[in-house]
Amino acid sequence: MLSLSCSSSSSSLLPPSLHYHGSSSVQSIVVPRRSLISFRRKVSCCCIAPPQNLDNDATKFDSLTKSGGGMCKERGLENDSDVLIECRDVYKSFGEKHILKGVSFKIRHGEAVGVIGPSGTGKSTILKIMAGLLAPDKGEVYIRGKKRAGLISDEEISGLRIGLVFQSAALFDSLSVRENVGFLLYERSKMSENQISELVTQTLAAVGLKGVENRLPSELSGGMKKRVALARSLIFDTTKEVIEPEVLLYDEPTAGLDPIASTVVEDLIRSVHMTDEDAVGKPGKIASYLVVTHQHSTIQRAVDRLLFLYEGKIVWQGMTHEFTTSTNPIVQQFATGSLDGPIRY
């Protein structure tokens, strides 16, 4: 889990030798042994909070639109005080390939949102832009009403943390499960090693893993690695008096898993958020989460509201129960898996 704080600047938790592009230069982070790590971007872990069960009488969104803004407007909600993240008319290209073409939407407090659509339509790209790993070529990203320019380290925005769980678990191969889950606490907190070790054990138990603390990632199955990454997203410094709310972004959390393992991960995502408390039973910080997925089971089990990305635009949005009954031809084809329709490969 890569958890990025909007409140200050330090290093991100990235796999060894992974490069990311800033707005003006390319930076490279190489992760050596734990004691030698240099932080440039603040990375933080915390408990993620429950989604909101939205109304069953939500307005249907069956017409094609150029942007994704407006779900709450359609429902008559004019107050934006509960908006945590907003993307306004976001564009992004890589070379000659235009990935995002004017994407707009809002993530509100307490929501569980799914981003779906065919491969190559910009789902992971918009996730990285929201997390601050990529800067949009055009358009704006607002964090709790404050405009963020460029990458997350370009300016300080307090009041919200944004976590990103990569499609791969992004665990450090040379570190044990205990060291992976408690990584930031060992490096950045004032907690003792015994305190961290106990908290890691409790957090792993909360995601259904016991007795794996001393194992290496290579000794775990794919599903277990996903759960370790989830545990890393839930753990936080319990000695702090104030913990800011967090929005957690999942990039295909069930990719590569069998149906049963997928169900375990989906239910963990939902149940951990629904408890409204952290791994050790203390009150949690209610926020929101967003899941990028291709899996129908994830759509049905883990999210309440859907955004459909196609050719770089949000062409449909609605509630989960509307997905299979939509008259939108693009959504119909995606829902049924038919080869006949607008989506071509």
UniProtKB/Swiss-Prot annotation:
InterPro entries: AAA+_ATPase, ABC_transporter-like_ATP-bd, ABC_transporter-like_CS, P-loop_NTPase. GO terms for cellular component: chloroplast; chloroplast stroma; nucleus; plastid. Residues 85-336 form the ABC transporter domain. Residues 1-46 form a transit peptide. Keywords: ATP-binding, Chloroplast, Lipid transport, Nucleotide-binding, Plastid, Transit peptide, Transport. Its main location: plastid. Disruption phenotype: Disruption in the biosynthesis of ER-derived thylakoid lipids, and accumulation of oligogalactolipids, triacylglycerols (TAGs), and phosphatidates (PAs). Accumulates Gal(beta 1,6)betaGalDG, an unusual form of digalactosyldiacylglycerol. Growth retardation, early bolting and no viable seeds produced. The keyword Chloroplast applies. SUPFAM superfamilies: P-loop containing nucleoside triphosphate hydrolases (SSF52540). It is found in: Plastid, Chloroplast stroma. ATP binds at G117, P118, S119, G120, T121, G122, K123, S124. The keyword Nucleotide-binding applies. GO terms for molecular function: ATP binding; ATP hydrolysis activity. GO terms for biological process: lipid transport. Catalytic subunit of the TGD complex, a lipid translocator at the inner chloroplast envelope membrane made of TGD1, TGD2 and TGD3. Interacts with TGD1 and TGD2 with an overall subunit stoichiometry of 2 TGD1, 2 TGD3 and 8 to 12 TGD2. Interacts with TGD5. ATPase transporter involved in lipid transfer from the endoplasmic reticulum (ER) to plastids, and necessary for thylakoids formation. Not involved in transition metal transport pathways. PANTHER family: PROTEIN TRIGALACTOSYLDIACYLGLYCEROL 3, CHLOROPLASTIC (PTHR43023:SF3). Belongs to the ABC transporter superfamily. ABCI family. This is Protein TRIGALACTOSYLDIACYLGLYCEROL 3, chloroplastic. It comes from Arabidopsis thaliana.
